[in-house]
């Protein structure tokens, strides 16, 4: 209550309470522009107009709440009760007229009801269909990054670069927010998943089916300007395979329409052309609100099927210069040749190498910036509101990542980051005006905003893009530069 004071007089002798209240009402309460509100054994003096109803509205907007549960026993709580609507629940505690929908008489019952509500919410979050964060695998081409769930589902991918709008965001909004899934037609919930050697090429295996996923790193793509990216999915084995292609433009905020073309699919009406090359797949388009989803079923008989999601081109023709199998080989070689040069410790060497590969995958090749994460809005605590967009380059965090790779014998990332940071310093109005974070291209991060269309990971809202920390003063920002 930064603009008011509350005078409580519960558990005070009546004569002393009466005297204190009289002095307050004949004193400060009579001053100009002081607003007085009386409740149960409390008097509030405020210098601005405010109420519990205003507070409810502000909190609802701040956390993106879809419903509010409010218990109150005071006359001042009526301001909150009258603001509740729709699925909200209002409960009056005690006697007296009230705008609340429900009533309980025993204050101790409030604790019991809240405990039951907390238990139900905890069970909901634990049982939500959210794959544990640590079970996701990372794909990267040094510009675009994607997450793959244990069932070979692309659940997160932004393009044309890591901090761009999401094309698939099931991670934060469930299936309706977009995914790209390959799975056996007959359900099998126990696939095995592992990286192919010391690389970011991922293999998901069922008894009769293997899906190999990678973002193409051949032909120098990791250091090329963002805008042309290929996600390749190679399907091998025998039996019937179900493919679900459900892109959702801009986190699902824009209608996503698909066009069936010879050799694959095209996402209609996009700023940058996006196509899915899928030779031999017969597609059915399903209407899902303002979006369309393509579903195809293919029977494999030993020959591999290769799907190519091409961002930045409208061509569905087969690439002659570098066929998918050669790009697979070169992408694997790109990661393994880098990992082979690391000076790994004797203890837990494979785990350290895998961690180093993740850090390398977070390096933005065209400029040298290093992002803090490939994602936005994964919660610090399930159900909480501390869900931030970390798809940017913090001077401090990036310096720590570069330092870790230097300790393992890889210096190129630190040199590239230094070039990125020097460019940021050159553009700064003055050294003391350095911000804690910048985009991967070294420019100011946009204003923080919330995406109300997404329910959040395991119900953790709000989902944010941008980061308000850009306006903070963090003195440790000068350490990495020094």
Report residues per predicted region.
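A general structural motif
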Residues: 2, 65-67, 87, 238, ...
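Short, glycine/serine-rich, charged loops/turns that create anion-binding
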Residues: 11-12, 75, 97, 161, ...
